[in-house]
Amino acid sequence: MLLTQTTTPEDVKALDRAELPLLCGEIRHAILESSAAVGGHVAPNLGVVELTVALHRVFNSPTDKIVFDVSHQTYAHKALTGRAYTYIDPARYGEASGFANPDESEHDLFAMGHTSTSVSLGCGLAHARDLAGDAYNVITIIGDGSLSGGLAFEGFNNAAELDSNLIIIVNDNDQSIAENHGGLYRNLAELRASNGTCERNVFRAMGLDYRYLDAGNDVLALVDALQELRDIDHPIVLHVSTAKGKGFEPAQSDPERWHHVGPFDMATGRKLCPGHPSKPAPRTYADITGEALSAAIERDSQVVGITAATPYIMGFTPELRAAAGKQFVDVGIAEEHAVTFATALARSGAKPVFGVYGTFLQRAYDELWHDLCLNDAPATILVFGASIFGTTSETHLSFFDISMLGALPNMRYLAPACMEEYLSMLSWSLDHREHPVAIRVPGIGLVSRPDLAPAEDADYGVARYNVVRQGRDVAVLALGDFFKLGERVANRLAAEYGIEATLVNPRFATELDREFLDSLAAEHRVVITLEDGILDGGWGERVACYLACTPVRTRTFGIAKGFPDRYDPNELLAQNGMTVENMAAEAVRLLNE
């Protein structure tokens, strides 16, 4: 097996040319086998195997600097830079990060996982090289989907002013996470159709040299093309056409659904339920969101769904997107534009709903502040994956959202504890015309709690906490999807200590029910808060601050500020004192002081 003997760039250079296609086949098979067991970014990685092998054949990493945009497509790169074990040894599957990680290897220059950064990083690397008088190559690889992010164009604009080596490889597979959208992609299609010769050329228009290679999955053709560009003395774009999902028919025929997947059956391509290989995946909040919004779109021509290249998180399948027509807009990987676009829609009488991962909403903070909230536009933002139990890579952490949105005037951030509350809040937000509304979609699986179901005419215009169980002395306020955890704490207080605690479902992540807190302070001696996010600037701190001038003892539970990486969620909770046993004991300790 070539791959077991080819684990460094030097090994790649030592192979005969005829062995390179064989190596590519082995890497592709290893990526598939390991991803079938632990999940991963399957389609993107299968499409760049040949390009990655060619890069390490031609260039001398880490002396030559190679930067993969997003870095979700670095599996082959990792296999060829000392980390093949994570793809060929079942006992070590998933051991290496799914993204670039400088702590793993000197060949990974930056910790990264968000899109459109590579060209800017390349410009910085090239400028630093020139200042130092060095002469190495700087190569960035950016997928065509990442070109829809504004930062990419800021980088291209700056790159055109360099007068030294910078090789920008545009990996064009005619696909973002879902299909591409926007005028840029019409030009890329024209360039592909004309073999790079059409007169209209967005890269040349920005002042960059340009070459095109149609054979983006031919490793020998790629080696030859890169050899010609090695040590070039000016910035150049190499535009290569590749097939996303190359070599695995399910991924190649449906690259959107195979962009990132959990464990799957390699023989059939069927997705598997973790822990229950024979069961299909369960229903999700994405499913019910797609159903609810599709029904709203059918009823009301002013409802507009918006996504930044991730329609699947809102449950919008290709069929639902087609049915919605102009009432569903994919703006590409452009969260900043999505927020400002939604602002104008809302101020013009439409009812926009922007669904976005919490980790990606961070990119649009100024637009949330300056455009949405300053203009008090009644748009709805659905924040997905904002949980300790969401993506655990340090590059995709999503639990800073409560602190982030809580600082914004006019923003109402709702935190449902179950699907019944979520659907009620979503329905209310569509007709709410006074302020921006964000909803923190629960991140710990679909939970049905009919006992928490709001009234049909529920109004979330004023912060009102929901007392689920009335008690005395101790109050447990558990926000959003941590309500169930708070319920367990209250149950333990009763069973272990004989304390009947008041159990509260707050529902509002950035606003306080001051009237309720005043009454709470009059009847309780201890208040503990639980939230699925960081403590600094969080909801619990607001509660504690409000109660600080009362006799009530307050203890906030959440996660310490930091960048935990590939953590076990339950271990992280334990490290932060958030076990049921500890939280109950802490409440009792405060009560007895």
Features from the language model and the residues they span:
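N-terminal amphipathic, basic-rich helices that act as targeting or association modules
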Residues: 1-79, 204, 215, 219, ...
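Glycine/charged-rich beta-loop-alpha catalytic/anionic-binding loops adjacent to active sites
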Residues: 29-36, 95-111, 133-139, 317-329, ...
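A short, small-residue-rich loop immediately preceding and capping a beta-strand
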Residues: 38-40, 64-67, 110-111, 134-149, ...
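Cofactor-binding active-site loop characterized by glycine-rich and histidine/acidic residues
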Residues: 41-162, 303, 317-318, 457-460
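Non-catalytic terminal/interface segments that mediate subunit docking, oligomerization
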Residues: 65, 248-362, 367-377, 477-480
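A glycine-rich helix N-cap at a beta->alpha junction
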Residues: 86-96, 161-173, 373-385
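Glycine-rich ThDP/TPP pyrophosphate-binding loop and its adjacent helix/strand module
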Residues: 108-264, 270-278, 282, 286, ...
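Peripheral docking tails and interdomain loops at the edges
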Residues: 266-275, 390-392, 412, 534, ...
